[in-house]
Amino acid sequence: MPFIYINILLALTTALLGLLLFRSHMMSSLLCLEGLMLSLFIMSALTTLGTHHTLSITMPIILMVFAACETALGLALLVTISNIYGSDYVQNLNLLQC
């Protein structure tokens, strides 16, 4: 396994560990999710470059589109939670309340 794949797997693991450890604040969870998506994008782009298939070129682009949608929804949710509750704690996000 090349050295760059080991670095990307380490970044992916660090982002996942950060998501598990810092899940009390919404902003830190969103940052860890972005790191996770960026690591997945780089890994899929490098894999696509290594395979030389023309049909697999669109996979990293589609992944970035989903990452941008996730970012927009996450920031909208963060702004809504901050305006309603005054903080960005994930525990304020209770979907069972009316």
From Swiss-Prot:
Its EC number is 7.1.1.2. The chain crosses the membrane at residues 2-22, 30-50, 61-81. It is found in: Mitochondrion inner membrane. Core subunit of respiratory chain NADH dehydrogenase (Complex I) which is composed of 45 different subunits. The keyword Chloroplast does not apply. It is a multi-pass membrane protein. The keyword DNA damage does not apply. Core subunit of the mitochondrial membrane respiratory chain NADH dehydrogenase (Complex I) which catalyzes electron transfer from NADH through the respiratory chain, using ubiquinone as an electron acceptor. Part of the enzyme membrane arm which is embedded in the lipid bilayer and involved in proton translocation. GO terms for biological process: ATP synthesis coupled electron transport. This is NADH-ubiquinone oxidoreductase chain 4L. PANTHER family: NADH-UBIQUINONE OXIDOREDUCTASE CHAIN 4L, NADH-UBIQUINONE OXIDOREDUCTASE SUBUNIT ND4L. It catalyses: a ubiquinone + NADH + 5 H(+)(in) = a ubiquinol + NAD(+) + 4 H(+)(out). One of its GO terms (cellular component) is mitochondrial inner membrane. It is an enzyme of class 7 (translocase). One of its GO terms (molecular function) is NADH dehydrogenase (ubiquinone) activity. Belongs to the complex I subunit 4L family. Keywords: Electron transport, Membrane, Mitochondrion, Mitochondrion inner membrane, NAD, Respiratory chain, Translocase, Transmembrane, Transmembrane helix, Transport, Ubiquinone. Pfam families: Oxidored_q2.
